[in-house]
Regions:
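Walker B catalytic acidic pair
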Residues: 56, 119-120, 131
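Conserved alpha-helical scaffold flanking the Walker A/P-loop in AAA+ ATPase domains
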Residues: 41-44, 97-117, 146
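C-terminal engagement/docking regions of AAA+ P-loop ATPases
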Residues: 1-9, 14-15, 247-331
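Conserved beta-strand position immediately N-terminal to the Walker
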Residues: 52, 116, 154
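Walker A/P-loop
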Residues: 46-83
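Conserved C-terminal "switch" segment of AAA+ ATPases
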Residues: 11-18, 31, 168, 182-254, ...
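Canonical AAA+ ATPase core
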Residues: 98-103, 120, 124-128, 136-227, ...
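Pre-Walker A (pre-P-loop) alpha-helix and adjacent loop at the N terminus of AAA/AAA+ ATPase modules
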Residues: 14-60, 242
Length: 331
């Protein structure tokens, strides 16, 4: 059997296995007006087992989007408002003494769920941020002397308000790097906002149907891993990430003094995983360069450090990524 035959068979399998993506999108569109990119990124994160950092002003349906997704796949959802007085125990749980049983018992925190919305994550102290990020990385929580596995799928969507920065605790670069995607959400278009008004003036707000089970997502993840990625695509991904570290090697010497640090190997891994998930969403069994380009900004924008010179000239990571994509040779 030739490679082409294998890929053709895999492609047919993916087309069949990915049909539920359209059903999820259809159910979410009943509730979410516009924000197609946000819905797409939620699916990428869900299918590639990656967490998402959202940046956008309040009122752009961030909570509604992840809550709706949890209902569509019949999963559990928790929204945690991060505040300066929040403690790690408020997040993960603690040991409490039961007078009835005359012993300490575990009271699990809200993080023991499938979908977590960590609202305004940069408002909580470093200890709380660290507790959340440990759960994201290890998929487990330690309370007292016992360690508890978190349910799968486990997806964290953390939000940051780009405008209000007073009284916040910015996330360290090492912790931000643990988010697979950083998605910037913009305001809806005029016609979309008119539909939002109409929707909210209806007698009953639309409700999504539960069409899947969390176990279906776990099965889908196994299929996503089977999506074929050629060595040329892998090299393309490595070149993109290396261009953020050594821009001069790729004819981008003008960025050498503008970038303080580039993407880590985790960036390469996340770019490959996100590209596979994107190909799956597009009902393909193989990754093409356009898949990598489609997810590149969301995967890389929080993994490039800008120097004072870059900030002084108003250079953004968006512009750097776009320039890299225009310069690095496409296979």
């Amino acid at each position: 059997m030739t490679i082409n035959t294998d890929i053709r068979a895999l492609n047919e399998k993916i087309q069949l296995e990915s049909q539920f993506v359209d059903l999820i999108t259809m159910e979410m569109n009943k509730v979410i007006v516009g924000q197609k990119h946000l819905v797409e990124c939620l699916l990428i994160g869900l299918l590639s087992d990656g967490h998402i950092l959202l940046e956008g002003v309040p009122g752009l349906a961030k909570t509604l989007a992840i809550n709706t997704l949890s209902k569509v796949i019949d999963a559990k959802f928790a929204r945690i408002q991060f505040t300066p007085d929040l403690l790690p125990a408020d997040l993960v749980g603690t040991m409490i003494y039961s007078q009835k049983r005359e012993e300490f018992i575990v009271k699990k925190g809200p993080i023991f769920t499938n979908f977590v919305l960590a609202d305004e994550i940069n408002r909580a102290p470093a200890k709380v941020q660290s507790a959340l990020l440990e759960a994201m990385q290890e998929r487990q929580i330690t309370i007292g002397e016992n360690t508890y596995k978190l349910e799968a799928p486990f997806l964290v969507m953390a939000t940051q308000n780009p405008i209000e920065q007073e009284g916040t605790y910015p996330l360290p670069e090492a912790q931000v790097d643990r988010f697979m995607l950083k998605v910037v959400i913009n305001y809806p278009q005029k016609d979309e906002e008119r539909l939002i008004i109409q929707q909210n003036l209806m007698k009953e707000f639309p409700k999504p149907n539960s069409i899947l089970h969390p176990s279906d997502i776990l099965k889908a993840r196994d299929v996503v891993r089977e999506v074929y990625m050629d060595e040329k695509i892998q090299k393309y991904i490595v070149d993109i990430v290396f261009a953020t570290r050594k821009p001069a090697d790729y004819g981008l010497a003008k960025f050498t003094e503008m970038i303080t640090y580039g993407g880590s190997p985790r960036a390469s891994i996340c770019l490959a995983q996100a590209a596979k998930a994107y190909a799956f969403i597009k009902r393909r069994g193989y990754v093409i360069p356009e898949d990598v380009r489609a997810v590149c900004h969301d995967v890389m924008r929080h993994r490039i450090g800008l120097s004072y010179e870059a900030e002084a000239t108003n250079l953004t990571t968006e512009e750097i990524i776009s320039e890299i994509l225009n310069t690095v040779e496409v296979p």
